[in-house]
Amino acid sequence: MSALALPGSGARQRRFGGRQAFIEKITGMGLALPATILLLLTSLMPLVVLCVMSFTDYELGAVDFEFIGLANFSKAMGDPVFRRSLWNTLLYVGIVLPGAVCLGLLVAILVYGRKRTRSFYEIVYFLPVTSTLIAMATVWQFLLHPRLGPINTFLHMIGAGEHAFLSDPALVVPTLAVIGMWQLIGFNMVLFLAGLSAIPKDLYEAAEIDGCAGGIDRFLTITWPLLGPTTMFVIITTSITAFKIFDTVAVMTQGGPMGSSEVLLYSIYLEGFQYFHTAYAAALTIVFLVFILVFSVAQSFILERRVHY
């Protein structure tokens, strides 16, 4: 015996369903409202204030200011200190990026093949990531001391002479880059280990049957192509982290000697909190953010075309 639908029951169900969906939508928006307000207050509003301030002549402590258009940006383009800090930053990134990515991949491959000692090596290589860089910078200052540091002592023992790593303009940025790589290798290793774990072992067995017996052949034909997405992520995160160098410069060199280690973030810090040129520091910050954005988008576009999923 078939059930008979009551007249108007379908319309009532549609109205009830629409009312229920509306209530759920309002409830969801209400639950998301506190997080949205927090995001606006902590992220978007400071960025808006920063953009507005970059078009003024405001200095820290001043009671009034005037809008001066693009004067701060034109000043930055002609500022030799800004150009020098930009070059030092690019040099630092140019050393850290390939070094941290390649060494992180190498360490991940070596650790991945371990059985009993894998956890031990993972902890050892990841320790620099968990350490406070400001505290470790003090340790590095001692290690690199021209007379008391063990590194120079070892170099003197093997006849390589003593080197003023932090006071030689030609060595200071590469030295800071080595410290940056030391901190990033462990983090990149963990990411590459995750990528290696996702590669099916059947592919290696099939490649071995097809005559790809050597480790280098397996790496070039299977491991490296399938690590494409992981490598793209590692390159982008490493480059952004490298561009944000500040702690080691502030603690170890303060931009010296003679500005040879002054990087973008440290220049922004000096302009804003030492010279109180707040508006000019805001303009430099905008340039810095735009530069990182363009660099990251360009990296993503180039790497995306070469990644094999």
Label every model-predicted segment:
Residues 1-23:
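Short, Lys/Arg-rich, polar N-terminal cytosolic tail immediately upstream
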Residues 24-309:
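A structural signal for multi-pass alpha-helical bundles of membrane permease subunits
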